[in-house]
Amino acid sequence: MTGTGEAQQMIADILRKIVAVYAPQKVILFGSYAYGKPNEDSDIDLLIIKDTDKRPIERWMEVKRLLRDRNRTVSVSPLVYTRQELEQRLAIQDYFIQEVLEKGEVLYG
């Protein structure tokens, strides 16, 4: 686990890279870093919303490659959905997605 200031800087750096290179519509931080309860096993959980024709695994790999940093002590766990996929998840009352959208911290968009 990193200190609060260090964690905030790391998240800001990650966000800058995602916005500059991946150009998402929205980025939401969720999980322990968003809810103020990170521990030594916590990762940075991000929901990234981007309209694209790429398959889910291709999107995930693209973001993971973009964020690869051997010096970072905290891993990043991105979820990449299109707006249509999010709407579908909400239509079936996906509790996880509902919670992320309600409790997560919008970092961009």
Regions found by a protein language model. Give the residues of each.
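Conserved H-loop
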Residues: 32
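Catalytic core of pol beta-like nucleotidyltransferases
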Residues: 1-26, 35-40, 50-109
